[in-house]
């Protein structure tokens, strides 16, 4: 039996096993199973040894280990190196490689809101967008990397702990860090990468009066949280007439790319998969 894992702490809420086990059944990988495992930091070395011994084929890594896992790996792909964030592990030529599929997953999700022109090689129309990111956690670097690759060059970042925001600025010197509670003078996309909103009624310190569709016809509020489907952040934005998006599409697409790394199969995100998140 080929075993795949998602590791994190906490991990009970993870929907990854539902998605990957569905795909394994759909594509007749009958000798494969995907499980979730709660681990501590001192368990990471053991997980890596399981991969080396072929006891585990592939692993997804979630909070808080996306950076902490890196010292145990032999190699990183380009995006994982750039972001210093890993969410997928796979052994290639006896080397355990850390991949980042979060960035591609986020990139794909933006295509729903900013579809490409007829030339599929063109970047999304983000060059003139002023983008405001809230949070500086494990996935934020992946979001910045995706935005940069699509031509965004006006990125503002704010985090409750300014030191963490400044750490990201070392990776991406072109971003501008602003104090928590303040906002950039111009903005057309606001992205929440914090965990604020996972608990009912949690609110982000943001003045919605400054973000109305009257000012920007394509204003977007994006929350990486997908459960609940509509956070207070998104609900307030929607009620003021702004367009909103949650993290469901990003989550499904990052899973799709991880599955492809492990199996060389690009799975379809069909209605059954989407139901798991509804």
Q: How does the language model describe each region?
A:
Residues 128, 217-220, 224-278:
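Adenosine-phosphate binding glycine-rich loop
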Residues 8, 98-103, 110, 114, ...:
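Glycine-rich adenosine-cofactor-binding loop
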Residues 111, 127-128, 147-154, 162-181, ...:
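Nucleotide and nucleotide-moiety/phosphate-recognizing core
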Residues 61-68, 137-139, 195-198, 227:
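Short glycine-rich anion-binding loops that position phosphate/pyrophosphate groups of nucleotides
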Residues 2-114:
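Phosphate/diphosphate ligand-binding glycine-rich loop within oxidoreductases
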Residues 173-244:
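Rossmann-like adenosine-cofactor binding region
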Residues 158-162, 225:
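N-terminal Rossmann-fold cofactor-binding loop
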């Amino acid at each position: 039996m080929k075993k795949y894992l998602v590791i994190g702490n906490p991990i009970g809420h993870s929907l990854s096993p539902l998605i990957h086990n569905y795909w394994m059944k759909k594509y007749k990988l009958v000798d494969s199973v995907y499980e979730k495992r709660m681990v501590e930091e001192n368990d990471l070395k053991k997980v890596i040894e399981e991969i080396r011994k072929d006891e585990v084929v592939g692993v997804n890594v979630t909070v808080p280990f996306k950076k902490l896992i890196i010292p145990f790996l032999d190699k990183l792909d380009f995006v994982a190196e750039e972001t210093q964030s890993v969410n997928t592990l796979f052994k290639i030529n006896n080397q355990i490689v850390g991949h980042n599929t979060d960035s591609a997953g986020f990139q794909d999700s933006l295509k729903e809101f900013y579809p490409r022109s007829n030339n599929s090689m063109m970047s999304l129309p983000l060059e003139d967008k002023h983008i405001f990111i809230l949070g500086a956690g494990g996935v934020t670097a992946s979001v910045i990397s995706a935005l940069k690759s699509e031509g965004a060059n006006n990125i503002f970042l704010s985090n409750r702990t300014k030191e963490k925001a400044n750490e990201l600025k070392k990776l991406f010197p072109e971003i501008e860090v602003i104090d928590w509670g303040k906002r950039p003078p111009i903005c057309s996309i606001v992205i929440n990468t914090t965990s604020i909103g996972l608990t009912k009624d949690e609110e982000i310190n943001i003045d919605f009066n400054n973000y109305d569709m009257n000012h920007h016809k394509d204003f977007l509020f994006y929350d990486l949280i997908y459960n609940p489907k509509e956070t207070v952040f998104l609900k307030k934005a929607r009620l003021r007439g702004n367009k909103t998006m949650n993290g469901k599409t990003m989550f499904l697409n990052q899973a799709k790319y991880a599955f492809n790394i492990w199996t060389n199969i690009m799975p379809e995100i069909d209605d059954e998969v989407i139901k798991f998140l509804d």
